Amino acid sequence: MKSRLLLLTMLAGSAALYAQSNPLTSALKQNYNGVKNNILKAAEKMPDADYSFKAGEGSRSYGEIVTHIAQVQGALCAGAKGENKQFDVSKTDKASAVAVLKETIDYCDSVYEPVTDASAMEMGKMFGRDQPKFNILNFNVIHDNEMYGQMVAYMRIKGIVPPSSEGRP
């Protein structure tokens, strides 16, 4: 009986240790998944006709915001992966912008998924400078959140409830 209890305790302890073995990158992945889902939903939710909408003179259109997100996250994930991958962000209509956004999300998923706390300390390139992968991927999350904030403002101006506020009174 005591040996079974000891075995169960050891198994439970090792499972808890495994779950916490990559706390930095687990949190990073959680943050990335949250913002990428909001961005994709926001891109899909904005009507096609509003992709040319600009909040003011000198600002990007909604379509340009979506393709900017795709361009930057594609470049950052490529830098973290040690590649020089390019994505076609030249078209800002809804179909093209959402397509390239999905392409860069799929690509970034392949970069975030295998990263561990140890591999996150390996070097990659960000804007031509050597940086730990963690910094590059974390900057992507920061930038995505900043750009999602702009998407939210555009959606609110158009009377559309953004994904992160759906279901709230």
What do the predicted segments below correspond to?
Residues 29-33, 37-40, 50-87, 127-169:
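Short, contiguous alpha-helical
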Residues 45, 68-71, 103:
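Residues within well-ordered alpha-helical secondary structure of globular protein domains
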Residues 1-23:
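Bacterial Sec-dependent N-terminal signal peptides
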Residues 18-24, 93, 97-100, 156-169:
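Iron-associated oxidoreductase/ferritin-like identity signal
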